[in-house]
C-alpha cells in the first residue's frame, strides 16, 4: 500500500459518521447509506455541518486539511455569514467557497404566511412547505459542484439541520436511499448539534443592533445557557422534512422531476450523479 493510500485508509478509520472535532457541530459524512436497489452511497466525499465559525483550533484544522476538501457550499444568508464567517475555510485558498447572496429577512418572510407580522421567529412548519422553492439557487450551486466532481464537499448552514437537512435529503432520495432511512439521518441532528459551539463567542446583544440574524438568534435564546437542539418534528411526531418532501411530490410528482424542472438537471446529469456517488 502506498503512503497516500495508507493515509486515506487511516483517515477513513478515524470516524464512523461524525467527525471527531473539538469544535464541530453536526459535522458528519452524509453518505455511506444503502440504496433500495442494493447499492451504497459513497463515503468520504459528501459532508454536511452546522456553522463552522468555532472551528479554529490547530488540531481541528490539521484534521480537516487531511480530507482535502475542494468545495464548501454555504447555504446561509448574508447576515449569517457576516456574523459567523467560516474562518478556516476562508483562509484555505485551495477550497472553492460558494454561496448565494440573500438576506435572512427573505427567509423569515417566506415562512411568515399565517403568522403574526410581528413574529420575530421563523415558522418552521411554513418554511418546510416552501423550501423547494426558496432554496433553488443554493441547490443549483450544490448540484453543480457534484456534477463537476468538486468533491469532497461540505454542505452547511447554521444548525446543519433544516436547509442542509432538506438538500441532503433531496440528494439521498435521488440516489435511491429509502425515505425511512432519510428521516433517520435527518433526525440525527437533534443529538449531534452542539448549540453552544454554534453560537461561538459572539456578543449577540451588541450584534443584534445591526445584524438581523443576531436579533433572530436572541429570540431563540442565544446569549443564554445553550440547550440541546429541539426535535425536528411536529406535535404529532411527523418529521418536518416530510412536509418538504411531500410538497415536492404534490408539485412535481417526484424528486427527479423536481430537479429536472427547477434545478435544470437532465436525464444524463441524473444518471451521472447516480453512477458517481453510489457503488
What are these regions (language model features)?
Residues 159-164:
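Ser/Thr-glycine-rich phosphate-binding loops at phosphate-binding pockets of nucleotides
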Residues 1-154, 167-279:
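Cys-dependent protein tyrosine phosphatase-like superfamily
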Amino acid at each position: 500500500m502506498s503512503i497516500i493510500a495508507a493515509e486515506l485508509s487511516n483517515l477513513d478509520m478515524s470516524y464512523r459518521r461524525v467527525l471527531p472535532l473539538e469544535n464541530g457541530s453536526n459535522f458528519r459524512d452524509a453518505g455511506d447509506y444503502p440504496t433500495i436497489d442494493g447499492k451504497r452511497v459513497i463515503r468520504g466525499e459528501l459532508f454536511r455541518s452546522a456553522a463552522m465559525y468555532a472551528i479554529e483550533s490547530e488540531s481541528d484544522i490539521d484534521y480537516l486539511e487531511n480530507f482535502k476538501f475542494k468545495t464548501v457550499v454555504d447555504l446561509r444568508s448574508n447576515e449569517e455569514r457576516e456574523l459567523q464567517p467560516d474562518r478556516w475555510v476562508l483562509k484555505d485558498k485551495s477550497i472553492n467557497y460558494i454561496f448565494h447572496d440573500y438576506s435572512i429577512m427573505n427567509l423569515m418572510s417566506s415562512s411568515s404566511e399565517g403568522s403574526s407580522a410581528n413574529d420575530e421567529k421563523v415558522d418552521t412548519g411554513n418554511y418546510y412547505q416552501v423550501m423547494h422553492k426558496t432554496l433553488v439557487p443554493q441547490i443549483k450551486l450544490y448540484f453543480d459542484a457534484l456534477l463537476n466532481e468538486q468533491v469532497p464537499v461540505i454542505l452547511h448552514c447554521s444548525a446543519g439541520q433544516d436547509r442542509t437537512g432538506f438538500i441532503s435529503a433531496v440528494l439521498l432520495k435521488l440516489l435511491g436511499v429509502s425515505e425511512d432511512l432519510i428521516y433517520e439521518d435527518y433526525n440525527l441532528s437533534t443529538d449531534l448539534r452542539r448549540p453552544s459551539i454554534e453560537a461561538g463567542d459572539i456578543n449577540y446583544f451588541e450584534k443584534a443592533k445591526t445584524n438581523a440574524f443576531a436579533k433572530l438568534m436572541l429570540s431563540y435564546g442565544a446569549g443564554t445557557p445553550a440547550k440541546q437542539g429541539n426535535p425536528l418534528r411536529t406535535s404529532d411526531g411527523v418529521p418536518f422534512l416530510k412536509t418538504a418532501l411531500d410538497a415536492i411530490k404534490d408539485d412535481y410528482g417526484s424528486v427527479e422531476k423536481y430537479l429536472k424542472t427547477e434545478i435544470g438537471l437532465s436525464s444524463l446529469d441524473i444518471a451521472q450523479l447516480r453512477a458517481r456517488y453510489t457503488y
